[in-house]
Amino acid sequence: GAIARGLAKGTMFKASDITCTAQSDETLEKMRKIDPDFILTHDNVEAARNADIIIIAVKPWRVEMIIDEIKSVLDFEKQIIVSVAAGVTFDLLNTYLTKNTDFDCLATPTIFRIMPNTAIEVMSSMTFVSARNASKEQTDLIIHIFNELGNAMLVEERLMGAGTALASSGIAFAL
């Protein structure tokens, strides 16, 4: 929710460009009250099929289940996967994305791991970003998106744990 709210407040996307999925009607209704122009659905597959950038913002224990649900419609040559799940490494994400699939072994997903903080919805986040199998253009795009929501810093994956600790508690120090 916080990422979608921040993106809708920025200049790069309109709420009508953003599809939000959730399991519960209650969560979707909360998003509708925030902005009635969000595209809201329970259907992760349909949302992923039509997306250029897929942000997986769920609890870490749900990541594999969500990826298993959507991976049959993913196009690794065109889509960017962004994970907000703390502690879910690139190796794990890649395994989830490619296991038990007919994907060409040469196709590798473009994956970003990000760790924003709650200030993202008011466009004041410090977001740590790490990239795997991403071109310079893709990396620049993701950095640009999250710079609009505060500040974004590209870091090596090995630093994401420290970034997670800083992003999740650093805002308390600023207050």
Question: Where do the PLM segments sit?
Answer:
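Phosphate/pyrophosphate- and phosphate-bearing ligand-binding catalytic cores of soluble enzymes
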Residues: 167
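Extended low-complexity acidic/polar segments
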Residues: 30-61, 131-142
